[in-house]
């Protein structure tokens, strides 16, 4: 029997993109899907077959210290989440009341979801685009900076703002006070084999892995040939002209063909003379480029990591946030690539990439992880899990 399934996802590519193949699969099976997010992703949501519920939800550029994310950086980011939540919660609540769904599926990174699910008595599930947490693995500890200080004034301001949000919107404080709260059903878009402490997760968690062949793009980009190095710091934290300049020094006038995505924050003129073997753009069609790349120099956002592993492309990671640091450390731990230090030099950068290219252990591990991704189930498996969950809760 067809159901109404409502999605709420933060307007960030790394969180939206993993859900769209699932949405398309649910629509294909005859379900009605509504999807609330910011306007920047409206076309993608509609293309997946969902009805867009457009929210006044635009992510702000995230700034971090060049030595790595600090407690103040984290507090500033979390406070912006609270401000966004205050702005969009009334519209989200009205939508859920006026068009009550059979199942409410929300992004694990927004507390609006569990807060309103509890307030309105909705059947709920979460989507997890990064690591999941449980009683055995403390996700919060993995996602905070190394210098995390809970007594920092800016972090205390965030805690106060979060408590005020719960009071003003009449939602249980515990639903907004826990990072990555565990829902009764949690869809995790990574394979269990990549998950930290993966063996400890029970039936509340379905590890679907990334959707295979999910993102395609019409583009004028064509591969310049091998060896191809793809460089990107993602879409959220990429204002690093110093890093991109280091890359130009490391790989300029070498045998590498380099595709380097610098985002919208960096001015191309600030990078100085561009080497002839570099193709520099704000963004590239990442899934297409990774089909041809020999190495991916990445910020280690989870979506990027999964797409790299799916294509068996070794990773040189240069994380910008604590969340990305956890991903980068896992890549290194599983010998799928190597993590670079914050103060990386051109010589070290070039040596690391060259080493990754010829490391047979990494190649073997990439093949094994790609096999795990292919057997995880992807969007069809995630849709099966949601339908079974709905059937158990009729």
Q: Where is each model-derived feature located?
A:
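Short, solvent-exposed coil/turn linker segments
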Residues: 219-220, 267, 339-342
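Glycosyltransferase donor-sugar binding loop
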Residues: 234-235, 259-267
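Nucleotide-sugar-dependent glycosyltransferase catalytic domains
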Residues: 3-4, 28-229, 233-257
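Short glycine-enriched loops at secondary-structure junctions
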Residues: 11, 58, 130-131, 264-265, ...
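Glycine-rich His-Gly loop
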Residues: 9-12, 233-235
């Amino acid at each position: 029997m067809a159901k109404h399934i409502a999605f709420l996802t933060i307007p960030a590519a790394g969180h939206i993109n993993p859900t769209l193949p699932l949405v398309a699969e649910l629509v294909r099976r005859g379900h009605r899907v509504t999807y609330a997010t910011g306007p920047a992703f409206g076309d993608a949501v509609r293309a997946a077959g969902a009805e867009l519920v457009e929210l006044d939800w635009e992510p702000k550029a995230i700034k971090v210290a060049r030595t790595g994310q600090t407690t103040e950086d984290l507090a500033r980011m979390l406070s912006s989440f609270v401000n966004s939540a205050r702005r969009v919660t009334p519209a989200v609540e009205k939508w859920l009341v006026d068009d009550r769904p059979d199942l409410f599926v929300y992004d694990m990174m927004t507390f609006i979801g569990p807060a309103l699910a509890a307030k309105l008595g909705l059947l709920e599930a979460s989507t997890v685009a990064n690591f999941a947490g449980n009683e055995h693995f403390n996700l919060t500890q993995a996602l905070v900076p190394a210098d995390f200080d809970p007594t920092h004034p800016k972090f205390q301001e965030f805690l106060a703002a979060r408590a005020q949000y719960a009071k003003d919107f009449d939602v249980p404080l515990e639903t907004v006070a826990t990072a990555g709260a565990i829902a009764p059903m949690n869809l995790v878009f990574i394979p269990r084999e990549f998950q930290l402490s993966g063996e400890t997760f029970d039936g509340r968690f379905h590890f679907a892995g990334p959707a295979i062949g999910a993102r395609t793009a019409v583009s004028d980009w064509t591969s310049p040939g091998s060896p191809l190095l793809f460089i990107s710091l993602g879409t959220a934290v990429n204002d690093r002209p110093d890093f991109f300049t280091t890359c130009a020094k490391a790989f300029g006038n070498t045998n590498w063909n380099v595709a380097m995505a610098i985002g919208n924050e960096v001015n191309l003129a600030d990078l100085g003379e561009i080497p002839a073997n570099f193709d520099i753009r704000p963004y590239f069609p990442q899934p297409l480029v990774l089909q041809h790349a020999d190495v991916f120099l990445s910020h280690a956002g989870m979506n990027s990591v999964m797409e790299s592993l799916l294509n068996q492309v070794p990773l040189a990671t240069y994380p910008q946030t604590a969340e990305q640091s956890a991903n980068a450390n896992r890549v290194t731990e599983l010998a799928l690539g190597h993590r670079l230090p914050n103060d990386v030099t051109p010589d070290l950068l070039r040596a690391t990439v060259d080493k990754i290219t010829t490391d047979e252990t990494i190649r073997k591990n990439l093949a094994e992880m790609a096999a795990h991704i292919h057997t995880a189930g992807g969007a069809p498996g995630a849709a099966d899990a949601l339908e079974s969950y709905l059937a158990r809760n009729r």
